[in-house]
Amino acid sequence: MELKHGFGGALAGMDMTWVTDRIAVGGGIWHERNMIEVAAAGVTHVIDMQIEFDDTRLAEPYGVRVLWNPTDDDFRTKPAALLQRGVDFALAALDEPGSKVFIHCAAGVHRAPMMALAVLRAMGWPLDEALETIAEKRDVVDFADVYVRSVEEFIKSYDGAGK
């Protein structure tokens, strides 16, 4: 059995951290064994922020719906349309009873936490509480200032959010 090293050198399975009871953040799924873990955890929807790999074909056999929302981890301002797609997908998913959303990128450090922040902000969470909750639950998160600013610029134009 191939073992994957998690952060800090610890051996780990799927890199997934629940930041709320229905929203998880983590690293890449990459192969079927990890997709099986994701589906077994009750995840019904995946927002894949990594440009490196599209999870759609891996997810199909397990009935998991995927939004491939790829973006480079380039520390540049992210367009509102990117955040809008993810927020729309997540909120529609969360409207379904029993659904759970996994938001991931390659390592779960920058892009996925940015998208999770956008989702929580769109749900009405205050910025400080959303940042703190994500960072406390997933200690490898590194909120790049430019990504937080991208989310806040998006939220300014998002109807009814962040209030």
Segments predicted by a language model, with ranges:
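Cys-dependent protein tyrosine phosphatase-like superfamily
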Residues: 1-101, 107, 115-163
